[in-house]
């Protein structure tokens, strides 16, 4: 650190930072600007640390606080505020190019990605040491598994999602049948991970070496592929946050389902009737019936039946099969040649209300699953023990029971005097028994042409659902239908357990009636308890697997793979660690990523600490000591104060990698507190402007325009609309239409959820937010260490006419009326104080009041949102 004697007394300050800066200013005979006003300082600090403006009351408190440590206490208070994590998480998420969708042409949602965003917020608020912050994001999930006592398994698993938050080509990696495209998409995926880790942590532009040796930095192409091999066991996808948590919830759910199943079975046994499974099969619903015709998914044409055997013994498509059971005249299985809203049985049942002119749903109406994909066990509970019956329907299958007229009429006559109206009732428990990985199937029950039961998306986790419906007098058909839920999975399997028809009324003893009442109450209570069980938490993140072989790709061509490359790092940076040298082709994913995480955060690696303190400087001064925060190589900028950069990095190490300590050190310096406004006499700073127009010597503070999210949040704050609820899924200010390529259409809404801070926005990669994008909100398809600050006509149009701005202008006006009434002068004074964070002059109040009287309060609010003083921070 330079001694005070090395610089003039006018330049030297108490902070070592100021003494480093003073050395360079002394060389050029530049005098720094004085300290900014207290109003400007509190507003600057609030935006820098919290991303929102201070309230007028907070400004007044600081201005009136004459204690020597007033600024220090203000810094500490804001560093401790929860909004600090929300503000600074935005900077990190820019580097991570975080979003809530995949990107590319399918751009599907990542409904659980938000947990990573919340982890970043919480880690920053907790001042997680920066070395741990990096290590957990590279290898947190596997570090926690190896040492659960030293790591929070939950947090560390979420932290590792850093590797997966970038864009992902679903078509290239999943849907395409082309192995060439798959290899290219996977290579791009690994390149994204390598580039993200190395640029964010070490400021190295490693991806330049994908096709050849790095043109500027001493990085060989082999080293690029050695780093790629580190991540060759990393795939992206949803995963459980905690296996133990999932097991606890599943165990409790299975216990409740088992108890409810036993109760529902006892309830069903209180009724006397006939089993529908006995009618169509050998007592269990299985048989060797001929598979019916299906509908071609692409053309809608009828396909010819094939010879594949199915279930429903003795039942042939498009043929009525007579029975000898009371109440059932015949059974009918359709051939699939008819679709929704068309009759599906000769008995007259009509499939109304089924989502089905879409051939994806009715791509093949058939019966009979593939035996290997079917089990009668659900969540470990056997649903077809001796004495039970099962009636199974393959996905996109239907069966109709035509009811006999005479027995039904006799039954109704015999029960004509009963309180419940008599007749017969259909009861069953229905469950999904197909593949666990499937999203489930849809179930429909129709009586005549009326839909009486529907369950959309019935899956294994839903257990058995009870059905009970009384058949009205004169009912002629009972139809059961299962469809694939629109997912095109034809091996989904639905089973009706103990499906039966029974008299709806019979004489019960008082003891029986009491028992039935008790059973129903117990069943309802268990159903409510099941519904209240939380789902096991999931996060979109790293799905580890056995690492694949990595070969050097000649000129980056995935079809010209050369020698096998072992996992490793770059030789020009960091230590030669034994854990890296010991990696081999047999090393596990955990060994590879842990070795890299330790290499990055080794005290011998000079880059991570320097990269971090430079990013902090960049966000506090507008430009880093190195103007290229993610490129510390020969292609990047030279540091303006290399000794200061080294000293700050050493202080980070010395302070236990505490980020908040580094903030505090910078914010307490004279350099940070300098004015950004030139004095009225230009001669005082003429030499500084001539010699250092870009302010690389930090003789003044840089005025900065609010970034897009901060501008939106500030409008919400000033209008009184902002909702400060933290965490959870992002707000969705768009309409969503599920298609092959989903459609997102942004809207301006009035719900409280969308008035949360912008950090909680659900970010769509392929459909940028129109208002925020016009204000230089970055594209999350790429990493953004430095945001653009452009000045365009569309920005003026957006801040003047965008529906969100008009909405908030109106809410701002309503706030002013609530707080100060209808007097124009009071409204003007309060509006300027809220918007600018300072007391207005009498001239400003008079001019603003005249505008309110002539054009209305709304127009004043709208204009204030468009002033430079509102948009810029001095």
Regions inferred by a protein language model and the residue ranges of each:
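N-terminal pre-domain segments of enzymes
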Residues: 1-10
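Primarily short, surface-exposed interaction patches in extracytoplasmic proteins
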Residues: 9-43, 48, 52-83, 98-149, ...
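Sequence context surrounding c-type heme c attachment/ligation sites in exported
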Residues: 152-254, 772, 784
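Surface positions of alpha-helical coiled-coils, especially the charged/polar e/g heptad sites
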Residues: 238-241, 245-248, 252, 259, ...
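Gly-Asp-aromatic-enriched flexible segments
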Residues: 265-525
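A structural supersecondary motif
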Residues: 765, 773-783
